[in-house]
């Protein structure tokens, strides 16, 4: 299991314990048994969607550390949400995720 997956799991637990509803979003290209490519989601879709106890939507892109690459589509999505006063951000720890989701 890679570092990003471990961080993501810890974040999901912390958000759940804080009263958030958390959904792990899956996106990318997958291949069926017949080899056919299936694309789900869209470019820039964050890793986690949550609803905090106030009923506010929260979009979180999980990165293993602050040096990890941020794709232009990810940056654009997070910025678009913030422009609309929707809670969103890049996070590397449960503490950062709680800051975005609850503060």
Give the residues covered by each predicted segment.
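Catalytic phosphate/metal-binding cores of nucleic-acid and nucleotide-processing enzymes, i.e., regions
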Residues: 1-103
């Amino acid at each position: 299991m890679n570092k990003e997956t471990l961080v993501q799991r810890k974040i999901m637990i912390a958000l759940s314990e804080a009263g958030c509803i958390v959904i792990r979003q899956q996106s990318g290209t997958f291949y069926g048994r017949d080899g056919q490519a299936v694309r789900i989601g869209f470019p820039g879709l964050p890793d986690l969607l949550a609803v905090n106890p106030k009923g506010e939507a929260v979009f979180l892109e999980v990165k293993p550390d602050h040096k990890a690459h941020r794709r232009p589509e990810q940056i654009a999505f997070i910025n678009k949400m913030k422009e609309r006063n929707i809670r969103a951000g890049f996070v590397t720890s449960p503490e950062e995720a709680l800051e975005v989701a609850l503060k």
